[in-house]
Amino acid sequence: MPKMKTKKSAAKRFKVRGSGSIKRGQAFKRHILTKKTTKNKRQLRGSAAVHETNVASVKAMMPFA
């Protein structure tokens, strides 16, 4: 059986919290920001949790996290 490996692209995008939930960054805040309102950009700051329907696939990409 081959070695289990972490998908490095997933490891750079997700972090596992102490409670076991997975943290992700917000999308839509890299470019084309002039047409977005200040409120919209402010609400995109910070992090969010991965939805429960996607948690299993994210954990499969990071077997050692």
Swiss-Prot record:
InterPro entries in the record: Ribosomal_bL35, Ribosomal_bL35-like, Ribosomal_bL35_CS, Ribosomal_bL35_sf
GO cellular component assignments: cytosolic large ribosomal subunit
Annotated keywords: Ribonucleoprotein, Ribosomal protein
Protein name from the UniProt record: Large ribosomal subunit protein bL35
SUPFAM superfamilies given in the database record: L35p-like
One of the record's GO molecular function terms: structural constituent of ribosome
GO BP annotation list: translation
Similarity remark: Belongs to the bacterial ribosomal protein bL35 family.
Pfam families named in the record: Ribosomal_L35p
Native source organism of the sequence: Bordetella pertussis (strain Tohama I / ATCC BAA-589 / NCTC 13251)
Basic residues composition-biased segments: 1-16
Region (Disordered): 1-25
Entry keyword rRNA-binding: no
